[in-house]
């Protein structure tokens, strides 16, 4: 354990940031799974409504990834790679 006041503060800040980063990453994983489920539903029974649902899920997931990159949870290349993976899944389904 640190003895210096500023080091103690940094420990608290690092823990706070770790929990915030974990929440961002968890949310992105959840939205990615929802997107994948929407794509699977579309594959089994294609319709315009399900395609709209896929687009909506993709938009929400993209926005979460962009926000995570903006606040520094992900590097911009990691965010781009995750978004490209989603686009690849969508292209394979349609």
Curated annotation (Swiss-Prot):
Signal peptide coordinates: none
User: What species was this sequence derived from?
Assistant: Acaryochloris marina (strain MBIC 11017)
Q: Which family does it belong to?
A: Belongs to the bacterial ribosomal protein bS20 family.
Function, as annotated: Binds directly to 16S ribosomal RNA.
Q: Which GO terms describe its molecular function?
A: small ribosomal subunit rRNA binding; structural constituent of ribosome
Q: Which domain of life is it from?
A: Bacteria
Kindly give the Pfam families that the UniProt entry links to this protein: Ribosomal_S20p
One GO cellular component term noted in the UniProt record for this chain: cytosol
Q: What is this protein called?
A: Small ribosomal subunit protein bS20
UniProt entry keywords in alphabetical sequence: Ribonucleoprotein, Ribosomal protein, RNA-binding, rRNA-binding
Q: What is the lineage of its organism?
A: Bacteria, Bacillati, Cyanobacteriota, Cyanophyceae, Acaryochloridales
Name any Gene Ontology BP term: translation
């Amino acid at each position: 354990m640190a003895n210096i006041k500023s080091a103690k503060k940094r420990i608290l800040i690092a823990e706070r940031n770790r929990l915030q980063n974990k929440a961002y990453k968890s949310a992105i994983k959840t939205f990615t799974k929802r997107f994948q489920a929407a794509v699977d539903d579309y594959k089994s029974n294609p319709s315009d409504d399900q395609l709209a649902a896929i687009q909506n899920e993709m938009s929400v997931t993209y926005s979460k990834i962009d926000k995570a990159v903006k606040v520094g949870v992900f590097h911009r290349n990691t965010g781009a790679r995750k978004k490209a993976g989603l686009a690849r899944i969508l292209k394979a389904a349609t």
